[in-house]
């Protein structure tokens, strides 16, 4: 679904573990890393698209995650001109994204990058919370910074255990 301004409706997914680390995935056959993301199908809500993409890209089912929060608004980024396909109608100049922060309820073994038979990613790892902002491709960096800043209080709050003390987090 491309809107009248040329932006494709899309969802972004940040999966965090009990230590506040986030899942960082390498695009199949490339050297670029990013969070899972994908477009909305016609008639699909952002949450429905998120669950579909979650399974297609990383093999996780709704019962294996918990939605902690989502962005208050849609965030946009423009594609570099070299990536804009002029032969498609309508022309897509970028993405508008609704982001979701998920807590992994299962274990790492539940993550399956080949669940759909057409993998988007060929590797993944847990990284510290702010690492992706510095490492993502430059045209997505501003959106990543905004999302991570918006989600930071939720991530910190969920890391606190029942005694009110922060859990020890491994270094990476």
From Swiss-Prot:
The keyword Hydrolase applies. Its EC number is 3.6.1.-. GO terms for cellular component: cytoplasm. It comes from the Bacteria. Keywords: Hydrolase. GO terms for biological process: mRNA catabolic process. Residues 6-149 form the Nudix hydrolase domain. A motif (Nudix box) lies at residues 38-59. Pfam families: NUDIX. Its cofactor is a divalent metal cation. GO terms for molecular function: mRNA 5'-diphosphatase activity. Belongs to the Nudix hydrolase family. RppH subfamily. Accelerates the degradation of transcripts by removing pyrophosphate from the 5'-end of triphosphorylated RNA, leading to a more labile monophosphorylated state that can stimulate subsequent ribonuclease cleavage. This is RNA pyrophosphohydrolase. It comes from Shewanella denitrificans (strain OS217 / ATCC BAA-1090 / DSM 15013).
